[in-house]
Amino acid sequence: MQTLAQHLTSKAVNESLSQLILTLADTSKAISHAVRHGALAGVLGATEQENVQGETQKKLDIITNDMLKDALKADGTVRGLASEEEDHVVEVSANGQYLVCFDPLDGSSNIDINSLVGTIFSVLPAPAGELTETSFLQSGRNQLAAGYVLYGPSTMLALTTGQGVQLFTLHPETNEFLLTNAAMSISPDTQEFAINMSNQRFWEAPMQTYIADLLLGKIGPREKSFNMRWIAAMVGDVHRVLSRGGIFTYPTDNKDPKKPYKLRLMYEANPMALLVEQAGGKASTGYETILDIQPTQIHQRVAVILGSANEVDACLSYHGIDYSEEPTLD
């Protein structure tokens, strides 16, 4: 089996980007170690702090954020970073070539119940000139690399550098990420959907109708039965979609009119959308392709519908839009 470093060489990924990816991977090994130790190391539970989203931070949110910041500062290739746990962008190295956006511990509410969590990251080119928030406001099409690390029964890294999606598994003895799936592919059709049904009454009418039709199964207009899955961590739900197909959605809702969207564009939706498109799936807000959105702020939120291409098209048809064309992977 190829190691991650060997794989990057075989794909002719340039040296500096390879170095950055390896730094992210090495840091994820340390995060995996911290997650595994959990209560034994006294790192479970919440703090009294809130992040910029107004969400109470878990102890491991802060610990993993600091681990990634420290590693990226030492790497030398990073111009700046943006994190779910940082109010503002952080300048790293004046000579860095890349910007890194990340969610250090996606699904951290699952930590205290020993369920799935992960790290999501996105790598963008660093524009010339002074580093400001505007430097980061690039569409998802500009991503040079994206991926996530899933901390589950095995620690797994899903990665794209624009050449498909590869899956690596952390070997528990050698502590190396080894290539275990050279070409992840999302089946175009599915009978699985992932959504937080407790918000049903707050969704827009198109999504309410779409889900209602799925629940009708064979006797409904879709003429087939669907199963629902929900992990409550985007990283886990998207991993399932990449592994065996499905549709994942966190749609617009009016539960809190000031926050109609849940997921963040720059370090959740964009990297996951790139992975999904590179694996043959589609990713949309319901009204536009996620990777084509021009961001307006670092912590911008969007609706997310992604997964098996034909099922995403079916969902979008309820929104009155035909997205039947193949996604652009330039």
Swiss-Prot record:
Substrate binds at residues 106-109, 196, 262. It is an enzyme of class 3 (hydrolase). Its cofactor is Mg(2+). GO terms for molecular function: fructose 1,6-bisphosphate 1-phosphatase activity; magnesium ion binding. Homotetramer. HAMAP family: FBPase_class1. This is Fructose-1,6-bisphosphatase class 1.
